[in-house]
Design a protein with these regions (language model features):
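A detector for small-residue-rich transmembrane helices and their helix-helix packing motifs
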Residues: 2-271
Length: 271
């Protein structure tokens, strides 16, 4: 009588594929499922930068809510306390607000919409850019959006990740248009069209809704278009060459943003 090749148990007549008893076959199936689950990459591994940025935004929002800030209709004073951008404080002695304001949101609807947009764009950005290029592009575009808002509306407050998100869209538009990426022409045209429509629709929406700070959107978008265009030439270069170029690009960009901040600080009048 044949025996199971796994456990040595005698097999009943009737045929058993590969000479494995039902019990061992069931155990092997369960073990294979567990191994597949263990080896399956998590979202954090697949989208590390996007997951980290979204996690930071959610943590700030939870911190605000747990401290007593309304999750649906927060007061301006609470938003400013948590790092919103406002001319009186940002230009006086708290310049870090041009960065922290990108992680402060005006209620749950605001953060949900922004994080949904970031998740959608981030899935693409993780494939086009390396991690540092993605994160620095997002950060610098967010700062550029804050500076645009500060320069044009110094007496208003600003908060939210939309400037950085517009910047990410702009960088992707430039990368797909100028970067010679190894993407089929049809897919590239379709992606470009979707990115342009995303930016155009949201700019139009921002123009017709008075409460939306479209200057931050435009500032972030322009910064992203420029950064993406400058970075595009080395997106497919060898790692050492790409990293060297990235360092130079963001060093110069940082100096430019710093100079813009001091120009606004000197010439823009705020109450």
């Amino acid at each position: 009588m044949p025996t199971c090749v796994s456990c040595g148990r005698e097999l009943q007549p009737g045929g058993h594929p590969d000479n494995i008893c039902p019990e061992c076959r069931a155990k092997a199936f369960v073990q294979a499922q567990q191994e597949a689950k263990a080896n399956r990459p998590s979202l954090i591994k697949l989208m590390p930068v996007t997951s980290t940025i979204i996690g930071a935004n959610v943590l700030v929002f939870l911190g605000m809510t747990l401290s007593g800030v309304s999750p649906t209709a927060p007061q301006i004073s609470d938003l400013v306390k948590w790092g919103a951008n406002t001319g009186a404080q940002t230009l006086a002695s708290q310049p870090w607000r041009i960065w922290t304001s990108n992680y402060v949101h005006i209620g749950i609807v605001h953060i949900l919409l922004n994080m949904w947009c970031l998740w959608s764009l981030g899935a693409l950005a993780e494939r086009v850019f390396d991690r540092w290029t993605y994160f620095l592009t997002y950060t610098f575009c967010g700062i550029a959006g804050s500076l645009a808002s500060l320069g044009l509306h110094p007496n208003r407050f600003g908060a939210g990740a939309s400037g950085a998100i517009f910047g990410l869209a702009g960088a992707l538009i430039s990368a797909f248009y100028l970067g010679h990426l190894p993407v089929p022409t049809r897919a590239m045209k379709s992606t470009l069209r979707s990115l342009v429509l995303f930016a155009a629709y949201n700019l139009f929406f921002g123009a017709v809704v008075p409460a939306i700070d479209n200057s931050a959107h435009i500032g972030g978008l322009v910064c992203g278009l420029v950064l993406g265009a400058v970075l595009a030439r080395h997106l497919t270069s060898p790692p050492d060459e790409r990293n060297s170029w990235r360092q130079r690009v963001f060093m110069v960009s940082g100096i430019v943003l710093l100079a813009v901040f001091f120009l606004i600080r000197r010439y823009v009048v705020h109450v």
